[in-house]
Amino acid sequence: MTKHLKKKRKNLLLYVATMVAGCLAIILFTYQKFQSPVIKAGQAVEKKYSAMPVPTLYIHGWHGNERSTDQLIESAENEKGAKKVLKVKVSPQGATTYLGKWNSDVKHPLIQVVFENNEAEIPDEAGWLKTITEELRQRYGISRINIVSHSMGGPVTLFWALNLRDKNSPRLQKFVPIAGPFDGVIFTDDVPNQNRIKENGEPVWKNAAYQSYYEKRDDFPRGVSVLNIYGNLEDGTNSDYLVTNASARSLRWLIKDRVEYYDEKMIKGPMAQHSKLHENKQVDRLVNDFLFD
């Protein structure tokens, strides 16, 4: 009898121990179920954030249109495996229309920006650029962008970066202005060989717009890599016909203390004419290598 009771007691203790172990396992499983996903979700979001591709926006200049950036985009597609995923058209009233489909699986997504009013003032186009960047973030979660601009698209990008960009804006990672008139335009407020760049990079003559940029220079985002491309017809004007080399190169003095990397490339000869620069294969290669290599 005693032997029988001992056996029952042993079985009871074993049963209790098994139940306790089971309860502990359930508690531990439940805890992990509700706690672990918080960490994993955070890790997944971080991975997704870091893996999100960086789209490149192409912005035309004064009197420009989609043809102004077609060759640049096609060359990126053919040479670097990039793909145009969106075209954003902006009405004269600032309303945006998105054509195409965003695809986060594309390694080098390209976005073509077209202003239907291609004679709008710089602040207006910069405001439209702000709208686009905000919508890209809200719609697709885009947190970083590159910008390639031709002509007035350069000052438009600069105005946005200095005056309209905020902490919620996508971070400007790379900027490639082509033929950017940052300190005057020939036939408007500049004359060939009137201005020059000092050894320290400062332009001798500064127009009103440039002075306003200079006052806001500390608002240019840090860490941007810049490739500034400009043309020289080699006809004695030191210009691309519309933009003097001094006007284009004056950008450096504005942002030199803010950027992570800055370089300039002069294109020479007949194909360095202002409107031909965006049809120039040398320019295509420079832009593509800078953006995608």
Question: Would you name each region that the model predicts?
Answer:
Residues 3, 19-20:
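Short, low-complexity Pro/Thr/Gly
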Residues 1-12:
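N-terminal Lys/Arg-rich, disordered targeting/topogenic segments
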